């Protein structure tokens, strides 16, 4: 029995945009579209011999709801099936050219069964958004000159239920919102929530590019979580993975019996490191699929930013491959020109349709102008992760403080390229897995020195130009390496050193948000000035951060466990400089050394300035000082 095809949702213009690769709203056209009488189904399977919808509503019979191919050569099969209701489970039964029958999940499904089950579910949202105030002001909160302190988390292992069960979107919403607000973060970044069959992939092996994972609840439950965060004034960034997809039989791989979403040649279509499939960005319909996925999360879920995973693997044809294992582009080079074109189209569409949103590239190479506009030849991302800063900083802090003077260039080098891109400074989940240990475990010395060292790293990070990203558990110094099984070690907060570290992060966030000098010119060299970058002997750095109106914050970093009294620094302004933050304060678990609230300048020239400060530098500590004249300025 054929499904009826009396009311196609696809116009000729839709088909044109689909074939051109520029359709960004396919989630309204393809997949399962419910109404009161049933559902319209449409699926792209150009090489199939036959396609049927099978599901709980027709006893999984492959002859009960047979779809018909459109007569326009688009490769889309469609039809209306009566009696389908929200929550019904279904799949496509696809007869391949060789006679094989594949049962596939719907690529455009907006809900799915809880893994390991693999069926799609019919869905229509009933959520009523209450985040109008956030959405109206989002462009300001998300601007490149605004503070970004991003709390990265894996939803399934942040907190668990008392019985150890996975949390629910709806249940965790008030806890998460209250936590990030209390500790001063401006945004959360959720590791991928698109449906994925293997929990241990953390969401990075996606099968459902339009479906929020059912492990934590329904799509409306996720909307409730995002709504709650927005109402608390917290932005939401979502990890999105257009770089590859898994080869699970129910997913996109060989969808209609042919290599439809991926390349047929394994040198182009198979990822040797991840054992996954690579999208064929040269196929326009695939680009429209991915573009629609990105816009779906922004429009239907009010996501404020997309962190695009593994961009480097998209840009290079030889990524993870040896000589002879890859196919050069038409010019003989290793650049993936189709992926470049797709990323530019993606960013063009996002910033055109959602100017208050940011796209953030996880890109680990020196590809030029990743976060520069399209009109100057860039890829068009809003920001890019600074992997060089992360590697150099962690390498420096791993060294015994006694020997850091021999590695001083590691900690100063990042400033030389800090303004080439719009950088995010990431201490992400990638640095606390696969045997790398925890952040606190990377610090040398005894327990006191480890906590002092991590406070110093965070102080340096929050003072350094660039937006901030910290993975959950780092804020209180979890000692165990992160695992997706179980929750964070919340119990360690009963210990003063862990609680003190979290208090330090909270105060860093507060100062960072309050002081324009610490965030307004993150991407402009006018916002940074060295006082002294060359004191390698003492492992001391000192610099100024500046706002547009000239307000300043002085930052001094002492990366050895030696108190340094009578340390002289030249400064640009005479008068009293208040010690706004000191990571060695007893409140944070430090020794209490410092400058009794601040220091008055003396007319002694130093470091190119006519006046100077004589300071006590606490051990393994970072100081933030603010001139008294700037304390009274509301826009400083």
Swiss-Prot record:
GO cellular component, one term: cytosol
Database matches in Gene3D superfamilies: Glycosidases, Golgi alpha-mannosidase II, Immunoglobulins
Cross-referenced InterPro entries: A-amylase/branching_C (IPR006048), Branching_enzy (IPR037439), GlgB (IPR006407), GlgB_N_E_set_prok (IPR044143), Glyco_hydro_13_cat_dom (IPR006047), Glyco_hydro_13_N (IPR004193), Glyco_hydro_b (IPR013780), Glycoside_hydrolase_SF (IPR017853)
GO BP: any one term: glycogen biosynthetic process
Keyword list, A-Z: Carbohydrate metabolism, Glycogen biosynthesis, Glycogen metabolism, Glycosyltransferase, Transferase
Keyword Transferase: yes
GO molecular function term, any single one: hydrolase activity, hydrolyzing O-glycosyl compounds
Pathway(s) where this gene product acts: Glycan biosynthesis; glycogen biosynthesis
EC number(s) given by UniProt: 2.4.1.18
Active site: 309, 362
Keyword match Transferase: yes
Quaternary structure and partners: Monomer.
HAMAP family from the UniProt entry: GlgB
Its biological purpose: Catalyzes the formation of the alpha-1,6-glucosidic linkages in glycogen by scission of a 1,4-alpha-linked oligosaccharide from growing alpha-1,4-glucan chains and the subsequent attachment of the oligosaccharide to the alpha-1,6 position.
Family the entry assigns: Belongs to the glycosyl hydrolase 13 family. GlgB subfamily.
Stated name of the protein: 1,4-alpha-glucan branching enzyme GlgB
Gene assigned in the entry: glgB
């Amino acid at each position: 029995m054929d499904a009826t095809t009396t009311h196609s949702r696809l116009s000729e213009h839709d088909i044109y945009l689909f074939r051109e690769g520029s359709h960004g709203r396919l989630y309204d056209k393809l997949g399962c579209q419910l109404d009161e009488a049933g559902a319209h189904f449409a699926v792209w399977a150009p090489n199939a011999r036959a396609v049927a919808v099978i599901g709980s509503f027709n006893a999984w019979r492959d002859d009960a709801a047979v779809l018909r191919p459109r007569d326009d050569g688009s490769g889309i099969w469609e039809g209306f099936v009566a009696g389908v209701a929200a929550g019904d489970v279904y799949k496509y039964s696809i007869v391949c050219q060789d006679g094989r029958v594949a049962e596939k999940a719907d690529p455009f499904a907006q809900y799915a069964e809880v893994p390991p089950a693999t069926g799609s579910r019919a869905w229509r949202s009933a959520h009523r958004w209450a985040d109008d105030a956030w959405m109206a002001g989002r462009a300001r909160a998300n601007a490149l000159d605004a503070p970004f302190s991003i709390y990265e988390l894996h939803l399934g292992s942040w907190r668990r239920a008392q019985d150890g069960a996975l949390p629910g979107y709806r249940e965790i919403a008030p806890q998460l919102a209250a936590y990030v607000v209390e500790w001063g973060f401006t945004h959360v970044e959720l590791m991928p929530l698109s449906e994925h069959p293997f929990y241990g992939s953390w969401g990075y092996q996606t099968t459902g590019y339009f479906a929020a994972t059912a492990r934590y609840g329904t799509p409306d439950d996720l909307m409730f979580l995002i709504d709650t965060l927005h109402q608390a004034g917290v932005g939401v960034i979502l990890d999105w993975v257009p770089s590859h997809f898994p080869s699970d039989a129910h997913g996109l791989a060989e969808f209609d019996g042919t290599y439809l979403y991926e390349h047929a040649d394994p040198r182009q279509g198979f990822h040797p490191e991840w054992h996954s499939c690579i999208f064929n960005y040269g196929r326009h319909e695939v680009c429209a699929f991915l573009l629609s996925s990105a816009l779906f999360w922004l429009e239907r879920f009010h996501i404020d930013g997309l962190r695009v995973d593994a961009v480097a693997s998209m840009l290079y044809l030889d990524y993870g491959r040896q000589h002879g294992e890859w196919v050069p582009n038409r010019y003989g080079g290793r650049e993936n020109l189709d992926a470049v074109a797709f990323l530019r189209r993606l960013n063009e569409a996002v910033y055109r349709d959602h100017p208050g949103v940011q796209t953030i590239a996880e890109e680990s190479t020196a590809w030029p102008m990743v976060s520069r506009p399209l009109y100057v030849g860039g890829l068009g991302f809003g920001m890019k992760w600074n992997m060089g800063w992360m590697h150099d900083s962690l390498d420096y802090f791993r060294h015994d403080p006694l020997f850091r003077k021999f590695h001083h260039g590691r900690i100063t080098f990042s400033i030389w390229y800090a303004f080439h891109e719009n950088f995010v400074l990431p201490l992400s989940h990638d640095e606390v897995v696969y045997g790398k240990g925890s952040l606190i475990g990377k610090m040398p010395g005894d327990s006191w020195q480890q906590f002092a060292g991590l406070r110093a790293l965070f102080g340096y990070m929050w003072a350094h130009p660039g937006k901030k990203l910290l993975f959950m558990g780092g804020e209180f110094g979890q000692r165990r390496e992160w695992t997706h099984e179980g929750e964070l070690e919340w119990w360690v907060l009963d210990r003063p050193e862990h609680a003190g570290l979290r208090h330090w992060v909270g105060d860093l966030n507060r100062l960072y948000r309050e002081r324009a000098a610490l965030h307004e010119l993150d991407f402009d060299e006018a916002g940074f000035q060295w006082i002294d970058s060359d004191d390698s002997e003492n492992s001391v750095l000192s610099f100024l951060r500046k706002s547009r109106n000239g307000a300043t914050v002085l930052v001094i970093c002492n990366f050895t466990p030696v108190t340094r009294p009578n340390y002289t620094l030249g400064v640009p302004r005479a008068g009293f400089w208040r010690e706004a933050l000191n990571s060695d304060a007893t409140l944070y678990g430090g020794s209490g050394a410092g400058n009794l609230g601040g220091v008055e300048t003396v007319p002694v020239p130093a470091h190119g300035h006519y006046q100077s400060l004589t300071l006590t530098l606490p051990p393994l500590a970072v100081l933030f000082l603010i001139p008294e004249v700037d304390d009274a300025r509301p826009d400083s």
